[in-house]
């Protein structure tokens, strides 16, 4: 498995034309509901086979790159395919299914602390769907108290639930790391968010996007976090930990 540094990770993100945020904010799994079909099409399902169940989520951040977390690239199942723009957990009847040609962990990833829990997938061909925007480097896109949305195909009930067949969304509030440190040990590569008891990420949501919505459509959505620690430990807790996309070192390129 290859790995990449903070600077080169950022270079990949911006060198391939990943969309960046141009700033203005809209106030959307467990405890949520199905999103309208044809929305959040930058959300990707990661699959072992072309038409099998998505076992992780991801975010299309350029036509040929998907951002996800480290647990999604071979620890349980091989990340052989991504399904982009699909509303459904499995099958090939909507969206597009594209083969993964390489997967890279961030070199800063620490399996003990969970720092830099980020991975990048490169696709065999460009996707026709619009990538999600990346956050600004000045911390202006992640503000404690702001509303955010989590989307994924994870369990909708726990512990005896099953994965959602349709893409789900739930609204969460971003917490300061100081407040969240009462529950978890955090660093600057993480962001904490929660929606109260019963509104959370769950099994199957790992790697999926935490979104800041800035308009009535999806074209200005920004991916600020990736489902990380919370979905691997328990479901339905008041707050969960996400990998912080702002911490990837984009500022080193003057973004």
From Swiss-Prot:
Cysteines engaged in disulfide bonds, as pairs: 56-72, 180-192, 202-235
GO cellular component, one term: extracellular region
Keyword Hydrolase part of the UniProt annotation: no
Family note: Belongs to the peptidase S1 family.
Biological role: Secreted effector that suppresses host plant glucan elicitor-mediated defense responses. Targets host endoglucanases and inhibits the endoglucanase-mediated release of elicitor-active glucan oligosaccharides from P.infestans cell walls.
Chief subcellular location: secreted
PANTHER family: FI18310P1-RELATED (PTHR24276:SF98), POLYSERASE-RELATED (PTHR24276)
Keywords from the named record: Disulfide bond, Glycoprotein, Secreted, Signal, Virulence
One protein family per Pfam: Trypsin
Protein name listed in UniProt: Glucanase inhibitor protein 4
Subunit structure, as described in the record: Forms an apoplastic complex with host endoglucanases in tomato leaves during P.infestans infection.
Signal peptide bounds: 1-21
Entry keyword Glycoprotein: yes
UniProt organism field: Phytophthora infestans (Potato late blight agent)
GO process terms (BP): proteolysis
Cellular localization per UniProt: Secreted
